């Protein structure tokens, strides 16, 4: 006879002899021949006893102890379409729906907006071509710029060296242009009754090239009150590390060679030199670059050093 039973929650203090049917050994071995209705009554009567059943205030569904829980008769019945002892086929049962599992509306997956591989590859090749053309055009411009100046201004072929050399070359040309400006002479002619008088500027009476010097640091003319007394007319202008020297002195033997060697010994790199002579005077227009480590950082320092060089040259020429 098939026995209908229900599995109740296990009492932690009860005796358990079977994993699937914990109360089978206590009640069902001796009552196999009884009527199923009597068996259910016996199970209900055993709730209040301590024979392995849950107490009358234990809620088997929620795991709580409550007095108002009443067992439903359908819960105590074994499925009638299955023989006793057979397992329930869980594989044939339908899977839980997504709505029940998720607890709400099923989420729609977002479709990623992915570009076509060919389009991405075309964009990459386009960027590479544009960057390649830009670099090619920049190299052409740098090559033209480098060809317009002497090679020692840009000894390396990188962009920073070429641009820096071009800036230095422009500064040197500016200094050279300032030194090559022609003197401005004014001649006024007064006519009187019986004689003509010609007046020239005080510069022409003091010597040639005197109008080349606007604000000299040293002067050998007594009329230059603003300049210190020196061995020659010396004027120095400076822009950053580039300096322009204008020197008007008397001719002396081997003066140019001694002047150039002495200037280079002061850690001044000679960039440009122009020599103009007239009568017994000579005008030197020199462009130099102050090297790192040089002690001459101002126009006053450079002018004083040049004046000292000319003084030494004059002393050597007087002894020879």
Curated annotation (Swiss-Prot):
A Pfam short name: HLH
Lineage start: Eukaryota, Viridiplantae, Streptophyta, Embryophyta, Tracheophyta
Any GO CC annotation of this UniProt entry: nucleus
Official protein name in the record: Transcription factor bHLH96
Tissues where the protein occurs: Expressed constitutively in roots, leaves, stems, and flowers.
Provenance organism: Arabidopsis thaliana (Mouse-ear cress)
Domain ACT: 244-320
UniProt region (Disordered), positions on chain: 30-121, 184-206
Keyword annotations: DNA-binding, Nucleus, Transcription, Transcription regulation
């Amino acid at each position: 006879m098939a026995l209908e039973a229900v599995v109740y929650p296990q009492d932690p203090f009860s005796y358990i002899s079977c994993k699937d049917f914990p109360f089978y050994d206590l009640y069902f071995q001796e009552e196999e021949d009884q009527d199923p209705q009597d068996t259910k009554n016996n199970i209900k009567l055993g709730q209040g006893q301590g024979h392995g059943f849950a107490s009358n205030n234990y809620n088997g569904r929620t795991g709580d102890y409550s007095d108002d829980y009443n067992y439903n008769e359908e819960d105590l019945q074994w499925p009638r379409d299955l023989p006793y002892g057979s397992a329930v086929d869980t594989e044939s049962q339908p899977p839980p729906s997504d709505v029940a599992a998720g607890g709400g509306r099923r989420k729609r997956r977002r479709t990623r907006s992915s570009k076509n591989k060919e389009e991405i590859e075309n964009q990459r090749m386009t960027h590479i071509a544009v960057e390649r053309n830009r670099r090619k055009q920049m190299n052409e411009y740098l090559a033209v710029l480098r060809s317009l100046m002497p090679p020692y201004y840009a000894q390396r072929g990188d962009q920073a060296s070429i641009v820096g050399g071009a800036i230095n070359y422009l500064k040197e040309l500016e200094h050279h242009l300032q030194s090559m400006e022609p003197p401005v002479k004014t001649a006024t002619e007064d006519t009187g009754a019986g004689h003509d008088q010609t007046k020239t500027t005080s510069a022409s009476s003091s010597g040639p090239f005197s109008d080349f010097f606007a604000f000299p640091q040293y002067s050998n003319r007594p009329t230059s009150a603003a300049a210190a007394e020196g061995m020659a007319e010396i004027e120095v202008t400076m822009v950053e590390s580039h300096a322009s020297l204008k020197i008007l002195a008397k001719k002396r033997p081997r003066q140019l060679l001694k002047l150039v060697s002495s200037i280079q010994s002061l850690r001044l790199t000679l960039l440009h030199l122009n020599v103009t002579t007239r009568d017994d005077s000579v005008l030197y227009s020199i462009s130099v670059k102050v090297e790192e480590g040089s002690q001459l950082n101002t126009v006053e320092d450079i002018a004083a050093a040049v004046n000292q060089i000319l003084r030494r040259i004059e002393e050597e020429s007087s002894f020879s």
